[in-house]
Design a protein with these regions (language model features):
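Catalytic core of non-heme Fe(II) oxygenases with the double-stranded beta-helix
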Residues: 99-172, 207-213
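Active-site region of the double-stranded beta-helix
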Residues: 62-89, 93, 99-113, 120-125, ...
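Short conserved micro-motifs at the rims of enzyme active sites and ligand-binding pockets
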Residues: 26, 186, 208-211
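Non-heme Fe(II)/2-oxoglutarate
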Residues: 1-82, 103
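Exposed beta-sheet edge/beta-hairpin loop segments within beta-rich domains
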Residues: 163-166, 185-190
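Short, proline-centered helix/strand-breaking motifs
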Residues: 174-179
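Short beta-strand His + acidic residue motifs that chelate non-heme Fe in jelly-roll/DSBH
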Residues: 104-107, 181-188
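A short hydrophobic beta-strand segment most commonly corresponding to one strand
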Residues: 115-118, 191-207
Length: 215
């Protein structure tokens, strides 16, 4: 009997946060106010893109209380799926606000171990979600260069045309920090702003610092 094996899959986790509406109502007005007041504000690393960033400290800290537990649970669920030993970690992150012309170039989040994106204000019919590139790029490029490109939807070069990977407003996704990704400009010109929260997860102590993940 013949078999096909899809070896070395890339784990991407998605969950819709139940307290999304509350967090959006608190955070988006403040972020839009900052965006209009300081339209050129962006991170130092954002030199090859048309983007805008603000730090966690740019909004009232207690705004995070309504989603903090859900984010931590998602991180621990992702760690359990990966089979990671319990460890202490820190989260570092920032907000992104884009109008329909703005974009983020191809990048990854090394040296973090994995990263997250939370879609706070997002119109899936008009805005673009993050596009992930297939880590097996060498093989795919070889096939395309040999004029026999792969068309199997499980082996695409990126997730742009993956109809199974559709993001909704309120979704949080977690993915390996080494996974290359980009954010194109919006699918069409429109007046609403796209607002996301990006963060990295980095170990800060010995893997033996915690006996087990919380249940």
């Amino acid at each position: 009997m013949a078999d096909f094996f899809t070896l070395f899959p890339t784990p991407v986790y998605r969950v819709n946060l139940s307290n999304h509406k509350e967090f959006k109502e608190k955070s988006v007005p403040r972020l839009i106010e900052l965006f209009k007041k300081e339209p050129d504000k962006k991170a130092k690393w954002a030199t090859m893109c048309h983007t805008w960033q603000a730090g966690f400290n740019d909004i009232v800290p207690n705004y995070f209380e309504c989603i903090q537990k859900e984010v931590d649970v998602a991180i621990e669920e992702y760690c359990r799926f990966l089979g990671l030993p319990p460890f202490k970690y820190e989260k570092t992150g920032w907000f992104n606000v884009h109008d329909s012309s703005m974009y983020q170039e191809v990048h990854n989040h090394i040296p973090a171990i994995f990263s997250g994106i939370y879609y706070i204000q997002f119109d899936k019919t008009k805005d673009s979600q993050a596009i992930f590139r297939n880590p097996s790029e060498t093989f795919l490029s070889l096939m395309a260069g040999s004029k026999v490109p792969i068309s199997n939807p499980m082996l695409l070069q990126h997730t742009l045309f993956d109809n199974n990977f559709i993001i909704e407003e309120g979704d949080l996704i977690l993915f390996p920090a080494s996974l290359d990704h980009l954010v194109p400009k919006a699918k069409q010109s429109h007046d609403q702003l796209r607002v996301t929260l990006s963060f990295n997860v980095t170990p800060i102590n010995s893997v033996n610092a915690i006996k087990e993940w919380q249940k």
